[in-house]
């Protein structure tokens, strides 16, 4: 009997030692350990919860922890008025030298609207949306209106992950802020009639011990977004991604009509591959650039940003030797364009020369998610003859080439005179010089079998 008693004690001790350690951030009675920043919204303790009330004529208000946290697992529950917007800051800061102390940093979005982006990650007062829920639409049904919702946030090194009611929502790889405070946001209101509405938080607890031991396995995560420019995260490397541009040199690229990289018309500055401003002509400045090798089946991802009135493009299945005359090298094109200011947007047929379209062949929808003042992500998927265009995580075009319908489509386009256009088994990838300033970064490719 004594032997079994000792064994039981040992097992209990082992279980106790291995149990996850949680620390409450809110004692259910008062706001000890917290302080208010920026706005004048009111926070109260009611029924063992922190309740924030909206107030007119005041900016976003934050109830922040007096301590900072780096690697942690945070869990809590929230309940929010259906007409409000709110959030949970983490790894956030307030510095006098930054916008006069404005709270900034990562925010777990609380969004009860029909947009349904709860669980997404917003960079408050800094970069804006890092992980809108268009990147993971399966999680948009996780939020429960009028009920308590359970949040989980995991931060370990550069890995940041979120859950809502047990459903994985966001997953980013980022190194902007390694530590900071946690805060509960009461969003500013724009209509005085919305004053007095509330959002509540309860059961707020954090684990900061042996975090790596308790984070969720990779198989149970949302799709990852790498926010560190021109790098590959461990997950991307594991999945077979490669940098098509290294962010520093012209390695792997050349001019479409020359053996080397153009000596003018292009610049590499601060991790950005830039087409310099020219006369607006097609390949009349530095000329297009192409990959030195060809690609067959792949997923290509490119971040791009345009200046006002700009025109450019990303081409694939390119044969640089096909066009011996003036103009750009020939290939299928993911159009990059300022639809509002560039005249090419009104040419072609039914908008097939507008941004994200398969240039002069298939139009992207008018309601595509594009912001010409921000960075946008173009994704091109090629699997044999099946091709897709994606813009900012939303599929905007898909088509099949090498068939009668495709050939008929080409016959009514500007490519009609190029034999077998778009039907090549493989080709180069091209970034276009159209004489307008356009920026590229995060040029990545995953080759498919």
What role is predicted for each listed range?
Residues 20-449:
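Carbohydrate-interacting regions of secretory-pathway proteins
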Residues 1-21:
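Bacterial Sec-dependent N-terminal signal peptides
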């Amino acid at each position: 009997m004594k032997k079994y008693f000792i064994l039981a004690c040992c097992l209990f001790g082992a279980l106790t030692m291995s149990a996850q350690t949680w620390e409450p951030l809110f004692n259910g009675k008062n706001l000890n350990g917290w302080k208010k920043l920026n706005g004048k919204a009111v926070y109260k303790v009611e029924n063992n919860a922190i309740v924030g009330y909206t107030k007119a004529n005041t900016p976003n208000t934050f109830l922040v922890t007096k301590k900072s946290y780096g690697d942690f697992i945070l869990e809590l529950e929230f309940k929010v008025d259906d007409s409000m917007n709110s959030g949970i800051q983490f790894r956030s800061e307030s510095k006098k030298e930054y916008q006069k102390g404005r709270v900034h940093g990562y925010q777990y979005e609380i969004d009860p609207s029909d947009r349904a982006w709860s669980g997404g990650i917003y960079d408050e007062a800094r970069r804006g949306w890092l992980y809108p829920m268009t990147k993971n639409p399966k999680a948009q049904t996780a939020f429960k209106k009028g009920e308590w919702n359970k949040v989980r946030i995991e931060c370990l090194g550069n890995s940041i992950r979120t859950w809502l009611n047990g459903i994985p929502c966001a997953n980013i790889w980022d190194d902007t802020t390694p530590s900071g405070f946690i805060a509960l946001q009461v969003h500013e209101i724009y209509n005085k009639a919305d004053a007095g509405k509330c959002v509540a938080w309860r059961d707020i607890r954090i684990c900061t011990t042996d975090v790596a031991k308790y984070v969720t396995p990779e198989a149970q995560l949302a799709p990852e977004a790498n926010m560190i420019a021109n790098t590959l995260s461990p997950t991307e490397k594991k999945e077979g991604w490669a940098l098509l541009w290294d962010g520093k040199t012209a390695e792997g690229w050349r001019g479409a009509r020359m053996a080397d990289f153009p000596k003018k018309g292009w610049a590499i500055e601060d991790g950005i591959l830039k087409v310099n401003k020219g006369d607006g002509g097609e390949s009349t400045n530095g000329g297009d650039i192409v990959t030195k090798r060809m690609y067959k089946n792949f997923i290509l991802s490119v971040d791009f940003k345009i200046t006002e009135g700009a025109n450019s493009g990303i081409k694939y299945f390119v044969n640089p030797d096909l066009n011996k005359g003036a103009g750009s090298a020939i290939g299928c094109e993911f159009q990059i364009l300022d639809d509002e200011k560039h005249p090419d947007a009104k040419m072609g047929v039914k908008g097939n020369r507008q941004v994200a379209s398969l240039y002069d062949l298939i139009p992207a929808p008018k309601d595509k998610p594009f912001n010409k003042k921000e960075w946008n992500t173009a994704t091109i998927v090629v699997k044999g003859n099946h091709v897709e265009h994606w813009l900012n995580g939303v599929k905007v075009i898909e088509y099949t080439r090498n068939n009668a319908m495709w050939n008929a489509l080409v016959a009514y386009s500007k490519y009609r005179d190029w034999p077998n256009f778009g039907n090549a088994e493989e080709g180069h990838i091209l970034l276009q010089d159209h004489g307008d300033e356009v920026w590229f970064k995060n040029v990545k490719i995953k080759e498919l079998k």
